[in-house]
């Protein structure tokens, strides 16, 4: 079973408070999401492998470490996931970026894939799928399905806020995927919103409904 990591770093929790605040405007909301994504990327990459190299300092030759050639990819779930990409790329600028677009079928209420674009070397990369919210888990499960059926073998899922129902759904369908969360909230309400949550992340990030 994949592990669930909840980040309690003070900076993440501080910024998350303002992300939740209904008084936070679009510009500040977007900036805060970007900043938290960077902080979470720092934590999520903690186990990247290193290799020793020789480097010439102004004083003498020295042994030091670099990341051991790991190929990484970031895949936002459209549209709200886009707001987390730049924050991650600040730390991992060489990562390739793919996209998964989903919409909810008005009759079945199930997510339907309408757009997928991934790096050509998908089988060789470790992917971080990002979406600010993990509510019912339907979109996350479908996005992970999309990556796996195209050859992805090593995937992590990262979100700002999750409901227990969403975590359970992802673990049920993708027990090999680790989940990284800034906050695990109480539950979903009758409309499928995370409680207490932060509202609709996409609407707040882009100023549109």
Curated annotation (Swiss-Prot):
Keywords tagged on the record: Allosteric enzyme, Glycosyltransferase, GTP-binding, Magnesium, Nucleotide-binding, Transferase
One of its GO biological process terms is: UMP salvage
Give binding positions for 5-phospho-alpha-D-ribose 1-diphosphate: 79, 104, 131-139, 200
**SS bond partners:** none
Activity regulation description = Allosterically activated by GTP.
- Which GO terms fall under molecular function for this chain's record? GTP binding; magnesium ion binding; uracil phosphoribosyltransferase activity
Q: Which positions bind uracil?
A: 194, 199-201
The cofactor note reads:
Binds 1 Mg(2+) ion per subunit. The magnesium is bound as Mg-PRPP.
Pathway connected to this protein: Pyrimidine metabolism; UMP biosynthesis via salvage pathway; UMP from uracil: step 1/1
Q: Which reaction does it catalyse?
A: UMP + diphosphate = 5-phospho-alpha-D-ribose 1-diphosphate + uracil
Obligatory cofactor(s) = Mg(2+)
According to its UniProt record, the EC number is: 2.4.2.9
Q: Does the keyword Iron apply?
A: no
The record's Gene3D superfamilies line, in alphabetical order, gives:
3.40.50.2020
What CDD domains does the record tag this protein with? PRTases_typeI
**Alphabetized InterPro entries for the sequence:** PRibTrfase_dom, PRTase-like, Upp_B, UPRTase/APRTase, Ura_phspho_trans
- UniProt-listed NCBIfam families: PRK00129.1 (NF001097), upp (TIGR01091)
Stated role:
Catalyzes the conversion of uracil and 5-phospho-alpha-D-ribose 1-diphosphate (PRPP) to UMP and diphosphate.
HAMAP family in alphabetical order:
Upp_B
Family, according to the entry, reads as follows: Belongs to the UPRTase family.
Know the name of this protein? Uracil phosphoribosyltransferase
Q: Which organism is it from?
A: Bacillus licheniformis (strain ATCC 14580 / DSM 13 / JCM 2505 / CCUG 7422 / NBRC 12200 / NCIMB 9375 / NCTC 10341 / NRRL NRS-1264 / Gibson 46)
Lineage, broadest ranks: Bacteria, Bacillati, Bacillota, Bacilli, Bacillales
């Amino acid at each position: 079973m994949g592990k669930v990591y909840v980040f309690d770093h003070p900076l993440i929790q501080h910024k998350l408070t303002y992300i939740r605040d209904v008084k936070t405007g679009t510009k500040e909301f977007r900036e805060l999401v970007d900043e938290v994504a960077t902080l979470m990327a720092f934590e999520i990459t903690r186990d990247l492998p290193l290799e020793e190299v020789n480097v010439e300092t102004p004083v003498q030759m020295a042994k030091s470490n670099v990341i051991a050639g790991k190929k990484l990819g970031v895949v936002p779930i459209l549209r709200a996931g886009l707001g987390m990409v730049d924050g991650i790329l600040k730390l991992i600028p060489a990562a390739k970026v793919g996209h998964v677009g989903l919409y909810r079928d008005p009759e079945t209420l199930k997510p339907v894939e309408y757009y997928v674009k991934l790096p050509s070397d998908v089988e060789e990369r470790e992917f971080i799928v990002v979406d600010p919210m993990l509510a019912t888990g339907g979109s996350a499960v479908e996005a992970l399905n999309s990556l796996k059926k195209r050859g992805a073998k090593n995937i992590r899922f990262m979100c700002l806020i999750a409901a227990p129902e969403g975590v359970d759904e992802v673990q049920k369908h993708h027990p090999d995927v680790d989940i990284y969360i800034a906050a695990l909230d109480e539950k979903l309400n009758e409309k499928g919103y995370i409680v207490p949550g932060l509202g609709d992340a996409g609407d707040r990030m882009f100023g549109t409904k």
